[in-house]
């Protein structure tokens, strides 16, 4: 039986046909919204976070059926298997134990191993932060450069930026990911090799982009006067392949381990987060883990009807598989969370952008939606026009931090007001009759342009304050949401075979770009023409 033939899926399809034309404006009308109100019935909390799902195109019956689908699809079974360390990544024969990295129960899988490596990280981070760790000329470290890509970059970069207000002012952290030399070169202009520590992060330590940047940075250190014998003072590695790290030239004692039972996009809780720990300190890193662990416990223990990751995930299923939404927007009204949308792009689309079910049969229903976003209020002046008046319905997750992490507190009411007002405007809209009044009797032709359809669905997540703990809970919420949706779609969220083919062909094309001659029949006519054009340019 395929997922979309489950009884609850069929019930949801019937239910969708029944309510698809209903307008939330009518549901919120006082005469239709007696106590307990929608705002009360669709308010949930967990892991220190609060959620308002009331401005979604759902009823009590919708949530009941969505939870029923989650049960029928085996969400609980898959969740429990993941926490237990079972092989939930069958295509690679691996567990997915990112939750073990923040577990506090000594009975958790790999507990002693995780604690030992974290203690090594903490000792090293303290040395760097205190100034005890010195470069080859005896100066303290003032710059940390994290070189990695994908999960080795997006998570740490997002967290370091989000917790900037908690970071030591003595150290500036830079992130380099792109193989475009401009990325590394721009950072080189801002650092002093005598005061720089490079953290090279790669699960295999063979990743093209990471190793290209790592070699260039190592060469730059030597060119600037660092003896090769002193590079150990400036380079550390994080990898599941320690032998390859040592082969690169990093001292064995400077290698921090990650494990193959942790996927890259779930790895910021491990030594991949060393740049985070150096920036904010071991104590705050521990708070980050504690917040994630709190959400883990909520995900494990809360009934599905009140389970934040389950509800967030199933509401996403509702729009993707029944309304046919192609994308969804993440709009954090927090500049500190600037990089959260790009982090979630990888988490959601690399995890669930799949077409093959666990049994190898192709799905006949949509899976991951396009994830995108920008912090508020910037997005309001870029793409909110489309959200309000375009023909496409895009579900939105608003994220609001209720208290500021900076001293410019007078800005904050304006920020929150915009967030809440956008959710209200998207829900209510503006009718043609209302638009005519706004246009005025002298410009009736303007009225159609002032109509807002409304009925645009939004969820609002509330964070009391942006702390390491609350950030950890927020990240874990989305991690578990991904698992919930993968369970419903019957796909594997822990592999990423889709990135492999381009890598393989990329090596062939790279060789052709620099070879003395090229067999034009090796590639299609378009690719051959692109290679020829590039070869001519590179020879100039």
From Swiss-Prot:
The keyword Cytoplasm applies. Keywords: Cytoplasm, Gluconeogenesis, Glycolysis, Isomerase. It comes from the Bacteria. GO terms for cellular component: cytosol. InterPro entries: G6P_Isomerase, G6P_Isomerase_C, Phosphoglucose_isomerase_CS, SIS_dom_sf, SIS_PGI_1, SIS_PGI_2. Its EC number is 5.3.1.9. It catalyses: alpha-D-glucose 6-phosphate = beta-D-fructose 6-phosphate. The active site is at residues 350, 381, 503. The keyword Cytoplasm applies. One of its GO terms (biological process) is glycolytic process. It is found in: Cytoplasm. One of its GO terms (molecular function) is monosaccharide binding. Pathway: Carbohydrate biosynthesis; gluconeogenesis; Carbohydrate degradation; glycolysis; D-glyceraldehyde 3-phosphate and glycerone phosphate from D-glucose: step 2/4. Catalyzes the reversible isomerization of glucose-6-phosphate to fructose-6-phosphate. Belongs to the GPI family. This is Glucose-6-phosphate isomerase. It comes from Paraburkholderia xenovorans (strain LB400).
């Amino acid at each position: 039986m395929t997922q979309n033939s489950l009884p609850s899926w069929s019930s949801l399809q019937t239910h969708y046909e029944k309510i698809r034309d209903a307008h939330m404006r009518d549901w919120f009308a006082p005469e239709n919204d007696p106590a307990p109100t929608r705002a009360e019935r669709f308010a949930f909390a967990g892991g220190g976070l609060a959620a308002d799902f009331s401005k979604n195109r759902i009823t009590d019956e919708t949530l009941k059926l969505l939870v029923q689908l989650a049960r029928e699809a085996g969400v609980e079974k898959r969740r429990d298997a993941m926490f237990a360390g079972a092989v939930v990544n069958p295509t690679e024969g691996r567990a997915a134990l990112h939750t073990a990295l923040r577990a506090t129960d000594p009975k958790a899988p790999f507990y002693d191993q995780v604690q030992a490596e974290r203690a090594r990280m903490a000792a090293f981070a303290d040395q760097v932060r205190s100034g005890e760790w010195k470069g080859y000329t005896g100066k303290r470290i003032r710059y940390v450069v994290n070189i990695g890509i994908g999960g080795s970059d997006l998570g740490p970069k997002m967290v370091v930026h989000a917790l900037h207000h908690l970071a030591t002012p003595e150290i500036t952290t830079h992130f380099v990911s792109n193989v475009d030399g401009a990325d590394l070169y721009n950072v080189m202009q801002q650092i002093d090799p005598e005061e720089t520590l490079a953290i090279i992060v790669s699960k295999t330590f063979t990743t093209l982009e990471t190793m290209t940047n790592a070699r260039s940075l190592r060469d730059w250190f030597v060119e600037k006067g660092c003896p090769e014998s002193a590079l150990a003072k400036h380079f550390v590695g994080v990898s599941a392949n320690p032998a390859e790290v040592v082969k690169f030239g990093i001292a064995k004692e400077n290698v921090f381990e990650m494990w193959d039972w942790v996927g890259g996009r779930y790895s910021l809780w491990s030594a991949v987060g060393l740049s985070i720990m150096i920036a904010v300190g071991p104590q705050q890193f521990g708070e980050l883990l504690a917040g994630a662990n709190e959400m883990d416990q909520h995900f494990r223990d809360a009934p599905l009807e009140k389970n934040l990751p389950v509800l967030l995930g199933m509401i996403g299923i509702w729009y993707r598989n029944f309304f046919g939404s192609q994308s969804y927007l993440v709009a954090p009204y927090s500049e500190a969370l600037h990089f959260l949308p790009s982090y979630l792009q990888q988490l959601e689309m690399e995890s669930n952008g799949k077409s093959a079910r666990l049994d190898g049969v192709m799905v006949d229903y949509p899976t991951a939606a396009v994830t995108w976003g920008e912090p508020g209020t910037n997005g309001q002046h870029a793409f909110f026009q489309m959200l309000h008046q375009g023909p496409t319905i895009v579900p939105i997750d608003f994220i609001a931090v209720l208290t500021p992490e900076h001293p410019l507190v007078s800005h904050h009411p304006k920020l929150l007001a915009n967030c809440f007002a956008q959710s209200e405007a998207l829900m209510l809209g503006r009718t043609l009759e209302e638009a005519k009044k706004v246009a005025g009797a002298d410009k009736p032709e303007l009225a159609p342009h002032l109509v807002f359809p409304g009925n645009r669905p939004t969820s609002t997540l509330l964070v009391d304050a942006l702390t390491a703990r609350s950030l950890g809970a927020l990240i874990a919420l989305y991690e578990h949401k991904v698992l919930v949706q993968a369970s419903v779609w019957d796909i594997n969220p822990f592999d990423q075979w889709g990135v492999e083919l381009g890598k393989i062909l990329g090596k062939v094309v790279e060789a052709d770009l620099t070879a003395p001659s090229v067999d034009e029949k090796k590639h299609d006519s378009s690719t051959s023409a692109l290679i020829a054009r590039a070869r001519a340019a590179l020879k100039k």
